[in-house]
C-alpha cells in the first residue's frame, strides 16, 4: 500500500444502506440510516435515545480545506495522512472530558472505527459559536486597521498582536445563509452580536430566548475545560468554534448539546506554550497550513479576497503542494492528537476497507 492509499480522500461512496442522499461536507460525509436500521441499532446497541430517533453514520476524511477550497499534494496525495483519525480522537477526548465535568452531551452515540461516528439527528443552532482568548488572525487584522467593535463588543485601545485579551470573548457568526433577519446580510459567515440573536432567536434556531444564556455558558465552560487541559500540556488554547443543536431525550424534553467537532486543529488555534513565552508563534493547528499557503503562492490576495473565488478554486485544483508540506501538516495533527489523548493515532493501510468490514460484521449496515 502506498502513502496515497492510506489516505481516505473520498468518503461519500461507501455502500452503507440509506434511503436518503449522502450529505458531503468539506471533511465529513453523513449517511442517514433507514428508520428500520435506526430502530434496530437503538434497541440492540442500547443507545440512550428515544426509539424513533433518526441515526446517521458520519465518516470523516483526510481531506484538507483552507480558504474554502480543498488542496492536494504531489504523488496523488489527496489528503493528509492521519488527519481524520486525529480530529476524531481529539473530539472524542474533549467530549468525554465535557461529560466528566457535567457539561452537555454530544451528538455521538457510538464510535465503531477511528474514522466513524454514529450520531443522533439534531436540530442545529444556526450560529458558529466562536470564542477568543487572544487577539490574532482576522480580529487582529481588523483591529490593526482601526476597528474596535466586534460582534457588539468594544475592545480597548493599545492591544498588541497575539496578546491575551482581558476577557474571553464570544464573537458569533452566521452558520449558512440566513434570510429575512433585520440587519444581518444574507451571506454565510457574517459576524453577529448577541443582541442580533436575542431579537431573532427563533430564526437562529433557538427554541427559547433563555437558551442563549445556556449556549454561551456551554461555550465558555467548554473552552475553559479544554484550555486548562491544554495548559497542562504547555499548549495555549487561542480561539475555537463550537456548534450546538437540540435533541429530544427519552422523556420528550428538548436539550441543547454539542455538535460537530470540538477543540481540534481544524476548529481552533492552538499555540505551543514555550514558543509563545519566547515571543514566537508555533502553530499546532490548521493555521500553520494557512500561513504556508499564503507564503507558497506568489499572489496571496487570491486566498484572502472573496471576490477572487474562481481564481482561488483554480489555484487549489491545478497546484499539487509539495509532499513535505503535506507531511508537516500530518505531523502537526497527529502530534497534537497524541499529546491530547496520550495514545498513538492509528494509521490504517486501507481505511475504507476497514470501515466497510466493521459496519458489515458488527452493525449490518452494508448493502
UniProtKB/Swiss-Prot annotation:
Organism the protein comes from: Shewanella sp. (strain MR-7)
Gene3D superfamilies per record: ATP-grasp fold, B domain, Phosphorylase Kinase, domain 1
Annotated PROSITE patterns: SAICAR_SYNTHETASE_1
Name of the protein in question: Phosphoribosylaminoimidazole-succinocarboxamide synthase
Pathway the protein contributes to: Purine metabolism; IMP biosynthesis via de novo pathway; 5-amino-1-(5-phospho-D-ribosyl)imidazole-4-carboxamide from 5-amino-1-(5-phospho-D-ribosyl)imidazole-4-carboxylate: step 1/2
Transmembrane segments annotated in the record for this chain: none
Family in the record: Belongs to the SAICAR synthetase family.
Family annotation (PANTHER family): PHOSPHORIBOSYLAMINOIMIDAZOLE-SUCCINOCARBOXAMIDE SYNTHASE
Domain of life: Bacteria
Amino acid at each position: 500500500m502506498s502513502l496515497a492509499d492510506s489516505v481516505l480522500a473520498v468518503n461519500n461512496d461507501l455502500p452503507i444502506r440509506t434511503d436518503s442522499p449522502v450529505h458531503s461536507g468539506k471533511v465529513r460525509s453523513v449517511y442517514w440510516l433507514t428508520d428500520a436500521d435506526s430502530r434496530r441499532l437503538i434497541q440492540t446497541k442500547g443507545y440512550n435515545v428515544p426509539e424513533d430517533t433518526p441515526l446517521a453514520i458520519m465518516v470523516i476524511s483526510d481531506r484538507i480545506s483552507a480558504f474554502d477550497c480543498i488542496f492536494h499534494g504531489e504523488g496523488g496525495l489527496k489528503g493528509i495522512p492521519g488527519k481524520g483519525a486525529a480530529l476524531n480522537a481529539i473530539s472524542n477526548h474533549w467530549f468525554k472530558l465535557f461529560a466528566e465535568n457535567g457539561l452537555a452531551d454530544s451528538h455521538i452515540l457510538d464510535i465503531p472505527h477511528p474514522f466513524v461516528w454514529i450520531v443522533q439527528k439534531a436540530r442545529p443552532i444556526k450560529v458558529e459559536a466562536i470564542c477568543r482568548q487572544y487577539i490574532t488572525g482576522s480580529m487582529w487584522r481588523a483591529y490593526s486597521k482601526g476597528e474596535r467593535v466586534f460582534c457588539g463588543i468594544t475592545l480597548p485601545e493599545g492591544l498588541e498582536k497575539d496578546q491575551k485579551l482581558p476577557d474571553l470573548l464570544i464573537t458569533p457568526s452566521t452558520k449558512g445563509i440566513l434570510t429575512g433577519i433585520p440587519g444581518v446580510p444574507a451571506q454565510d459567515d457574517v459576524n453577529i452580536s448577541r443582541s442580533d440573536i436575542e431579537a431573532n432567536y427563533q430564526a437562529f434556531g433557538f427554541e427559547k430566548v433563555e437558551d442563549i444564556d445556556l449556549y454561551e455558558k456551554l461555550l465558555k465552560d467548554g473552552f475553559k475545560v479544554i484550555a486548562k487541559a491544554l495548559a497542562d500540556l504547555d499548549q495555549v488554547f487561542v480561539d475555537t468554534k463550537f456548534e450546538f443543536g437540540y435533541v429530544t431525550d427519552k422523556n420528550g424534553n428538548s436539550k441543547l448539546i454539542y455538535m460537530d467537532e470540538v477543540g481540534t486543529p481544524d476548529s481552533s488555534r492552538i499555540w505551543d506554550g514555550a514558543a509563545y513565552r519566547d515571543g514566537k508563534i508555533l502553530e499546532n493547528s490548521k493555521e500553520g497550513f494557512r500561513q504556508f499557503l499564503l507564503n507558497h503562492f506568489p499572489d496571496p490576495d487570491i486566498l484572502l479576497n472573496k471576490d477572487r473565488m474562481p481564481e482561488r478554486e483554480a489555484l487549489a485544483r491545478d497546484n499539487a503542494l509539495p509532499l513535505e508540506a503535506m507531511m508537516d501538516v500530518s505531523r502537526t495533527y497527529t502530534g497534537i492528537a497524541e499529546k491530547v489523548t496520550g495514545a498513538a493515532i492509528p494509521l490504517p493501510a486501507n481505511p475504507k476497507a476497514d470501515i466497510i468490514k466493521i459496519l458489515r460484521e458488527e452493525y449490518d449496515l452494508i448493502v
